[in-house]
Amino acid sequence: MLDKSVFCKIVTKDQLDCLQINHPKFMAEICIQGAQLTQFTPTGEQAYLWLSPDAEYQKGQGLRGGIPICWPWFGGLSMNPDQVKTQTKPTELAHGFVRTMDWSIREYRESAHEINIVMGISHSEASLAIWPFEFDLSCHFKLSNTLNVELKTTNLSSSNMYFSQALHSYFPTSDIHNTKILGAEKQNYVDALDLWKTKQQVESIAINKEVDRIYFGKSDYRILTPEHATCVKSNSLSSVIWNPWINKSKRLSQFSDNAYQSMLCIESANALEDAVSLPSLKSHTLKLNISR
């Protein structure tokens, strides 16, 4: 499929194969494992996404940075709604199983203006052993001077499917102390660091301590850093804001002690009460747009 491509080739980084794209309008990288977009930088601009300098391209483990796909559950299984938990065999696996599985390239189209890539994965013996649903999952990347991602779930089983999910986007900043997020004002959120209490955001979000919150409402945010303003829009009604801060940074894999100062996450999600109930043979699409 890529034999005649002018802009895209497959490269191997340590143990993982990646699509490496060098287009006149942008450069990008997508790992075959997890269909994880790790880099996207329009020509003449700074990177849209943060990738850990300590990221490890290893089979069977998540990669720290870019946009990991969390599916069919977000976070730890035990913190998901009962409908999601009862459908899944008990596991310590966080963020589901598709982020560490190889996806296939289903479609590739390129032009002088943009590149469209569709990657996909379906149920297998390995997935059915964990999660008893037949499914098809595809991720459409539309890459140009902005970034669009669409994660489409189709329920191929005969019964209702419950799942949570997230496009776990990492964003860069040169100084977390001089970074704020607009768009969450007056939204309710669940504070995972304070006994999962529900609170209300009054002002813009400033990150000056560990933050792990799920916000509910319209997903339309602006990240203001010393360098630029980044717009993050999604059709979901739940978004996760995360920064590990000082102590947790020391415990995270593929993450240096000071990395919290140069990143933050806004994760477009369907989490907690926003989890998805999908009837048999129906589809659901989670959409994300990132621009400046």
Where would I find each of the regions flagged by the language model?
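Beta-strand-rich N-terminal accessory domains
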Residues: M1-I67, K218-S238, W245, S280-R292
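Asparagine-centered strand-capping/turn motif at beta-strand->loop junctions
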Residues: I30, L151-S157, R292
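Beta-strand-rich interaction surfaces with strong enrichment in secreted/lumenal proteins
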Residues: Q58-K59, S138-H140, E273-L278
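Beta-strand/loop-rich accessory regions of lumenal/periplasmic or secreted enzymes
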Residues: Q61-G96, L182-N188, K197
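Extended, loop-rich substrate-binding clefts of extracytoplasmic carbohydrate-active enzymes
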Residues: T88-L143
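Acidic/His-leaning functional-site neighborhoods
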Residues: T100-M101, S204-L278
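Active-site/ligand-binding surface loops and adjacent short beta/alpha elements
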Residues: N160-Y162, A166-V240
